[in-house]
Amino acid sequence: NRVLFSAEQLQSTLDKAGYQVMMQQGDTTFSDPEIKTILLTEVNDTTLKKEGFHITTTGNLTRVSGRDGSGVIYGSRELIDRVNDSDGKLDFPEELKDGPEMVLRGACVGLQKMTYLPGHGVYEYPYTPESFPWFYDKEQWIKYLDMLVANRMNSLYLWNGHPFASLVKLEDYPFALEVDEETFKKNEEMFSFLTEEADKRGIFVIQMFYNIILSKPFAEHYGLKTQDRNRPITPLIADYTRKSIAAFIEKYPNVGLLVCLGEAMCTVEDDVEWFTKTIIPGVKDGLQALGRTDEPPLLLRAHDTDCKLVMDAALPIYKNLYTMHKYNGESLTTYEPRGPLSL
Protein backbone atom coordinates (compact mmCIF):
# COMPACT_ATOMS: atom_id res chain seq x y z
CA ASN A 1 0.00 0.00 0.00
CA ARG A 2 1.62 3.23 -1.17
CA VAL A 3 -0.30 5.45 1.26
CA LEU A 4 0.87 3.31 4.19
CA PHE A 5 4.43 3.40 2.87
CA SER A 6 4.21 7.21 2.69
CA ALA A 7 2.96 7.38 6.27
CA GLU A 8 5.77 5.14 7.50
CA GLN A 9 8.37 7.29 5.72
CA LEU A 10 6.91 10.46 7.23
CA GLN A 11 6.78 8.88 10.68
CA SER A 12 10.44 7.85 10.46
CA THR A 13 11.48 11.37 9.44
CA LEU A 14 9.49 13.01 12.24
CA ASP A 15 10.79 10.50 14.80
CA LYS A 16 14.36 11.37 13.83
CA ALA A 17 13.51 15.08 14.12
CA GLY A 18 12.47 14.49 17.73
CA TYR A 19 8.69 14.53 17.41
CA GLN A 20 6.32 12.11 19.10
CA VAL A 21 4.26 10.55 16.33
CA MET A 22 1.04 8.55 16.47
CA MET A 23 -0.09 6.91 13.24
CA GLN A 24 -3.76 6.10 12.72
CA GLN A 25 -5.41 4.40 9.73
CA GLY A 26 -8.94 4.75 8.44
CA ASP A 27 -10.14 7.68 10.59
CA THR A 28 -10.00 10.96 8.65
CA THR A 29 -11.66 13.12 11.31
CA PHE A 30 -9.69 16.05 12.68
CA SER A 31 -10.65 16.14 16.34
CA ASP A 32 -7.98 18.13 18.21
CA PRO A 33 -6.88 21.45 16.66
CA GLU A 34 -4.03 21.66 19.19
CA ILE A 35 -2.31 18.60 17.73
CA LYS A 36 -0.35 18.84 14.50
CA THR A 37 -2.07 16.42 12.10
CA ILE A 38 -1.03 15.23 8.64
CA LEU A 39 -3.76 13.52 6.62
CA LEU A 40 -2.74 11.38 3.63
CA THR A 41 -5.44 10.46 1.11
CA GLU A 42 -5.91 9.39 -2.49
CA VAL A 43 -8.44 11.57 -4.30
CA ASN A 44 -10.05 11.37 -7.72
CA ASP A 45 -8.97 14.89 -8.66
CA THR A 46 -8.61 15.11 -12.44
CA THR A 47 -7.06 18.58 -12.15
CA LEU A 48 -3.95 16.83 -10.83
CA LYS A 49 -1.47 15.13 -13.14
CA LYS A 50 -0.94 11.41 -12.88
CA GLU A 51 1.33 10.92 -9.83
CA GLY A 52 0.49 14.51 -8.84
CA PHE A 53 -0.39 15.84 -5.39
CA HIS A 54 -2.09 18.75 -3.63
CA ILE A 55 -0.90 19.94 -0.20
CA THR A 56 -2.99 22.33 1.92
CA THR A 57 -2.34 23.53 5.45
CA THR A 58 -4.93 25.19 7.67
CA GLY A 59 -3.87 25.73 11.26
CA ASN A 60 -2.47 22.44 12.54
CA LEU A 61 -4.01 20.32 9.78
CA THR A 62 -1.96 19.51 6.69
CA ARG A 63 -3.66 17.49 3.97
CA VAL A 64 -1.69 15.61 1.34
CA SER A 65 -4.03 14.53 -1.46
CA GLY A 66 -2.62 12.34 -4.22
CA ARG A 67 -4.16 11.70 -7.63
CA ASP A 68 -3.03 8.12 -6.99
CA GLY A 69 -0.81 6.25 -4.55
CA SER A 70 2.33 7.62 -6.18
CA GLY A 71 0.96 11.13 -5.79
CA VAL A 72 0.63 10.54 -2.05
CA ILE A 73 4.23 9.31 -1.98
CA TYR A 74 5.54 12.43 -3.74
CA GLY A 75 3.43 14.77 -1.62
CA SER A 76 4.79 13.09 1.49
CA ARG A 77 8.32 13.40 0.14
CA GLU A 78 7.73 17.15 -0.22
CA LEU A 79 6.96 17.32 3.51
CA ILE A 80 9.92 15.07 4.35
CA ASP A 81 12.29 17.30 2.37
CA ARG A 82 10.97 20.40 4.13
CA VAL A 83 11.53 18.82 7.55
CA ASN A 84 15.06 17.71 6.62
CA ASP A 85 15.98 21.05 5.03
CA SER A 86 14.78 23.18 7.97
CA ASP A 87 16.42 21.44 10.93
CA GLY A 88 13.21 19.66 11.83
CA LYS A 89 10.73 22.52 11.60
CA LEU A 90 7.16 21.70 10.56
CA ASP A 91 6.85 24.58 8.13
CA PHE A 92 4.46 23.13 5.57
CA PRO A 93 2.98 25.04 2.59
CA GLU A 94 -0.45 26.64 2.83
CA GLU A 95 -1.12 25.32 -0.68
CA LEU A 96 1.01 23.52 -3.22
CA LYS A 97 0.11 21.53 -6.33
CA ASP A 98 2.80 19.64 -8.18
CA GLY A 99 3.45 16.51 -10.20
CA PRO A 100 6.07 14.95 -12.47
CA GLU A 101 6.67 16.40 -15.93
CA MET A 102 8.25 13.23 -17.36
CA VAL A 103 6.23 10.02 -17.59
CA LEU A 104 9.10 7.60 -16.92
CA ARG A 105 11.97 8.55 -14.63
CA GLY A 106 14.44 5.92 -13.59
CA ALA A 107 17.87 4.37 -13.23
CA CYS A 108 19.48 1.44 -15.01
CA VAL A 109 21.36 -1.39 -13.29
CA GLY A 110 23.35 -3.77 -15.47
CA LEU A 111 23.28 -7.51 -14.85
CA GLN A 112 26.14 -8.06 -17.26
CA LYS A 113 29.91 -8.35 -16.92
CA MET A 114 33.01 -7.11 -18.71
CA THR A 115 34.06 -10.62 -19.74
CA TYR A 116 32.24 -13.55 -21.33
CA LEU A 117 31.09 -16.39 -19.11
CA PRO A 118 32.65 -19.76 -20.06
CA GLY A 119 30.56 -21.45 -22.74
CA HIS A 120 28.41 -18.36 -23.33
CA GLY A 121 28.26 -15.64 -25.94
CA VAL A 122 27.99 -11.88 -25.57
CA TYR A 123 25.10 -10.66 -23.35
CA GLU A 124 24.52 -14.16 -21.94
CA TYR A 125 24.61 -13.86 -18.15
CA PRO A 126 22.18 -16.03 -16.15
CA TYR A 127 21.19 -14.62 -12.76
CA THR A 128 23.40 -16.43 -10.22
CA PRO A 129 24.98 -15.53 -6.86
CA GLU A 130 28.39 -16.31 -8.37
CA SER A 131 28.03 -13.73 -11.16
CA PHE A 132 25.98 -11.11 -9.30
CA PRO A 133 26.27 -11.56 -5.50
CA TRP A 134 25.04 -7.99 -4.90
CA PHE A 135 21.72 -8.77 -6.61
CA TYR A 136 20.71 -10.93 -3.63
CA ASP A 137 21.37 -8.24 -0.99
CA LYS A 138 17.89 -7.19 0.19
CA GLU A 139 19.13 -4.48 2.55
CA GLN A 140 21.07 -2.85 -0.27
CA TRP A 141 18.03 -2.97 -2.56
CA ILE A 142 15.84 -1.28 0.07
CA LYS A 143 18.37 1.56 0.32
CA TYR A 144 18.54 1.82 -3.46
CA LEU A 145 14.75 1.85 -3.90
CA ASP A 146 14.43 4.49 -1.18
CA MET A 147 17.01 6.57 -3.03
CA LEU A 148 14.94 6.28 -6.20
CA VAL A 149 11.83 7.43 -4.32
CA ALA A 150 13.69 10.37 -2.79
CA ASN A 151 14.60 11.43 -6.33
CA ARG A 152 11.00 10.96 -7.55
CA MET A 153 11.91 8.08 -9.86
CA ASN A 154 9.23 5.59 -10.87
CA SER A 155 11.17 2.96 -12.82
CA LEU A 156 14.14 0.65 -12.34
CA TYR A 157 15.71 -0.86 -15.47
CA LEU A 158 17.54 -4.19 -15.20
CA TRP A 159 19.81 -4.74 -18.23
CA ASN A 160 20.40 -8.36 -19.29
CA GLY A 161 20.54 -10.42 -22.46
CA HIS A 162 18.00 -13.18 -21.75
CA PRO A 163 16.70 -13.03 -18.16
CA PHE A 164 13.62 -15.22 -18.51
CA ALA A 165 15.41 -18.57 -18.21
CA SER A 166 16.65 -17.45 -14.78
CA LEU A 167 13.25 -16.28 -13.52
CA VAL A 168 10.46 -18.50 -14.88
CA LYS A 169 9.84 -22.17 -15.66
CA LEU A 170 7.86 -23.14 -18.75
CA GLU A 171 5.60 -26.19 -18.73
CA ASP A 172 6.23 -26.79 -22.44
CA TYR A 173 10.00 -26.25 -22.17
CA PRO A 174 11.12 -27.35 -18.68
CA PHE A 175 14.64 -27.98 -19.96
CA ALA A 176 15.06 -24.30 -20.90
CA LEU A 177 15.84 -23.27 -17.31
CA GLU A 178 19.37 -21.85 -17.25
CA VAL A 179 20.15 -22.14 -13.53
CA ASP A 180 20.01 -25.00 -11.02
CA GLU A 181 16.95 -25.55 -8.85
CA GLU A 182 18.45 -23.95 -5.74
CA THR A 183 19.44 -20.83 -7.65
CA PHE A 184 16.04 -20.67 -9.34
CA LYS A 185 14.32 -20.63 -5.95
CA LYS A 186 16.64 -17.84 -4.83
CA ASN A 187 15.86 -15.91 -8.00
CA GLU A 188 12.11 -16.38 -7.56
CA GLU A 189 12.26 -15.18 -3.98
CA MET A 190 14.60 -12.27 -4.74
CA PHE A 191 12.77 -11.00 -7.81
CA SER A 192 9.42 -11.26 -6.02
CA PHE A 193 10.87 -9.30 -3.10
CA LEU A 194 12.33 -6.65 -5.40
CA THR A 195 9.17 -6.14 -7.45
CA GLU A 196 6.91 -6.07 -4.39
CA GLU A 197 9.11 -3.54 -2.57
CA ALA A 198 9.32 -1.46 -5.75
CA ASP A 199 5.53 -1.55 -6.10
CA LYS A 200 5.10 -0.08 -2.60
CA ARG A 201 7.21 2.84 -3.77
CA GLY A 202 5.41 3.38 -7.07
CA ILE A 203 8.31 1.95 -9.06
CA PHE A 204 8.02 -0.31 -12.11
CA VAL A 205 10.79 -2.90 -12.44
CA ILE A 206 11.44 -2.90 -16.18
CA GLN A 207 13.41 -5.87 -17.47
CA MET A 208 15.57 -5.30 -20.54
CA PHE A 209 16.44 -8.09 -22.98
CA TYR A 210 18.12 -8.46 -26.38
CA ASN A 211 16.60 -10.25 -29.37
CA ILE A 212 16.66 -12.92 -30.43
CA ILE A 213 18.59 -14.72 -27.67
CA LEU A 214 17.71 -18.25 -26.53
CA SER A 215 18.59 -19.94 -23.28
CA LYS A 216 21.65 -22.16 -23.68
CA PRO A 217 19.88 -25.40 -22.57
CA PHE A 218 16.95 -24.65 -24.89
CA ALA A 219 19.28 -23.99 -27.83
CA GLU A 220 21.30 -27.14 -27.18
CA HIS A 221 18.14 -29.25 -26.86
CA TYR A 222 17.08 -28.29 -30.38
CA GLY A 223 20.55 -28.07 -31.92
CA LEU A 224 20.35 -24.28 -32.31
CA LYS A 225 22.69 -21.39 -31.62
CA THR A 226 21.76 -19.11 -28.73
CA GLN A 227 22.20 -16.17 -31.12
CA ASP A 228 22.25 -16.01 -34.90
CA ARG A 229 21.78 -12.66 -36.60
CA ASN A 230 20.93 -14.29 -39.92
CA ARG A 231 18.41 -16.76 -38.51
CA PRO A 232 14.80 -16.25 -39.59
CA ILE A 233 11.96 -16.25 -37.08
CA THR A 234 10.66 -19.80 -36.62
CA PRO A 235 7.45 -20.99 -34.90
CA LEU A 236 9.51 -22.81 -32.24
CA ILE A 237 11.61 -19.78 -31.30
CA ALA A 238 8.58 -17.49 -31.34
CA ASP A 239 6.57 -19.86 -29.15
CA TYR A 240 9.38 -20.19 -26.61
CA THR A 241 9.87 -16.44 -26.36
CA ARG A 242 6.16 -15.61 -26.23
CA LYS A 243 5.59 -18.13 -23.42
CA SER A 244 8.65 -16.86 -21.53
CA ILE A 245 7.33 -13.30 -21.62
CA ALA A 246 3.81 -14.38 -20.65
CA ALA A 247 5.11 -16.35 -17.66
CA PHE A 248 7.25 -13.40 -16.54
CA ILE A 249 4.37 -10.91 -16.71
CA GLU A 250 2.05 -13.33 -14.92
CA LYS A 251 4.49 -14.20 -12.15
CA TYR A 252 5.89 -10.86 -11.01
CA PRO A 253 3.89 -7.74 -10.05
CA ASN A 254 4.57 -4.27 -11.37
CA VAL A 255 7.00 -5.23 -14.14
CA GLY A 256 7.48 -3.85 -17.62
CA LEU A 257 9.82 -4.68 -20.49
CA LEU A 258 12.58 -2.85 -22.35
CA VAL A 259 13.03 -4.52 -25.72
CA CYS A 260 16.17 -4.30 -27.85
CA LEU A 261 15.45 -5.65 -31.33
CA GLY A 262 19.10 -5.23 -32.26
CA GLU A 263 22.19 -7.44 -32.12
CA ALA A 264 20.66 -10.81 -33.10
CA MET A 265 17.98 -10.07 -35.69
CA CYS A 266 18.38 -9.62 -39.42
CA THR A 267 15.79 -7.34 -41.03
CA VAL A 268 13.45 -4.51 -40.08
CA GLU A 269 10.56 -6.65 -41.36
CA ASP A 270 11.53 -9.30 -38.81
CA ASP A 271 11.70 -6.59 -36.13
CA VAL A 272 8.10 -5.58 -36.83
CA GLU A 273 6.87 -9.16 -36.89
CA TRP A 274 8.75 -10.12 -33.73
CA PHE A 275 7.53 -7.11 -31.76
CA THR A 276 3.89 -7.30 -32.85
CA LYS A 277 3.40 -11.08 -33.15
CA THR A 278 5.63 -12.44 -30.38
CA ILE A 279 6.53 -9.87 -27.73
CA ILE A 280 3.27 -7.91 -27.42
CA PRO A 281 1.12 -11.09 -27.59
CA GLY A 282 3.32 -12.56 -24.83
CA VAL A 283 2.65 -9.53 -22.62
CA LYS A 284 -1.08 -9.77 -23.35
CA ASP A 285 -1.12 -13.51 -22.57
CA GLY A 286 0.39 -12.81 -19.15
CA LEU A 287 -2.09 -10.02 -18.43
CA GLN A 288 -5.03 -12.17 -19.54
CA ALA A 289 -3.95 -14.97 -17.18
CA LEU A 290 -4.18 -12.46 -14.32
CA GLY A 291 -7.46 -10.93 -15.50
CA ARG A 292 -5.74 -7.55 -15.86
CA THR A 293 -6.93 -4.89 -18.29
CA ASP A 294 -4.11 -2.38 -17.73
CA GLU A 295 -0.99 -2.23 -19.88
CA PRO A 296 2.42 -2.16 -18.18
CA PRO A 297 5.07 0.03 -19.83
CA LEU A 298 6.74 -1.46 -22.89
CA LEU A 299 9.84 0.35 -24.14
CA LEU A 300 11.41 -0.12 -27.55
CA ARG A 301 15.11 0.65 -27.76
CA ALA A 302 15.89 2.58 -30.94
CA HIS A 303 19.19 0.75 -31.49
CA ASP A 304 19.69 -1.19 -34.73
CA THR A 305 16.08 -0.95 -35.90
CA ASP A 306 13.62 1.39 -37.61
CA CYS A 307 11.97 2.62 -34.45
CA LYS A 308 9.19 4.61 -36.12
CA LEU A 309 8.21 1.72 -38.39
CA VAL A 310 8.01 -0.70 -35.46
CA MET A 311 6.10 1.76 -33.26
CA ASP A 312 3.60 2.57 -36.01
CA ALA A 313 2.87 -1.15 -36.40
CA ALA A 314 2.61 -1.72 -32.64
CA LEU A 315 0.48 1.23 -31.51
CA PRO A 316 -2.82 -0.14 -32.88
CA ILE A 317 -2.47 -3.20 -30.62
CA TYR A 318 -0.68 -1.74 -27.56
CA LYS A 319 -0.86 1.83 -26.28
CA ASN A 320 1.53 2.10 -23.32
CA LEU A 321 4.60 2.26 -25.56
CA TYR A 322 7.79 4.29 -25.26
CA THR A 323 11.13 4.55 -27.03
CA MET A 324 14.64 5.12 -25.71
CA HIS A 325 18.20 5.75 -26.86
CA LYS A 326 21.25 4.57 -24.94
CA TYR A 327 24.05 6.99 -25.72
CA ASN A 328 27.12 4.82 -26.10
CA GLY A 329 30.64 5.99 -25.33
CA GLU A 330 31.82 5.29 -28.88
CA SER A 331 29.21 7.76 -30.12
CA LEU A 332 30.22 10.49 -27.70
CA THR A 333 33.99 10.40 -28.17
CA THR A 334 34.04 11.52 -31.79
CA TYR A 335 33.07 14.80 -33.44
CA GLU A 336 31.94 12.88 -36.53
CA PRO A 337 28.17 12.34 -36.83
CA ARG A 338 27.22 8.73 -36.22
CA GLY A 339 24.41 6.73 -37.77
CA PRO A 340 21.50 4.97 -36.06
CA LEU A 341 23.51 1.82 -35.32
CA SER A 342 25.65 3.74 -32.81
CA LEU A 343 22.72 4.42 -30.47
Regions found by a protein language model. Give the residues of each.
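N-terminal segment of the mature soluble domain
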Residues: S6-G26
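Short, well-ordered secondary-structure micro-motifs within conserved domains or adaptor modules
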Residues: M22-K50
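Structural motif
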Residues: N1, L39-N44, S65-R67, L111, ...
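A structural preference for short, hydrophobic beta-strand core positions in alpha/beta folds
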Residues: M23-Q25, Q207, L300
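Extracytoplasmic/secreted cell-surface and envelope-processing proteins
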Residues: R2-L4, V72, A165-L167, S215-P217, ...
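Feature activates predominantly on carbohydrate-active enzymes
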Residues: S6-Q9, T13, T46-G52, T56-T234, ...
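Surface-exposed patches in mature extracellular/periplasmic domains of secreted proteins
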Residues: Y19-D27, G88-E95, W159, L261, ...
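Catalytic-core regions of glycoside hydrolase
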Residues: N154, E178, K185-E188, S192-F193, ...
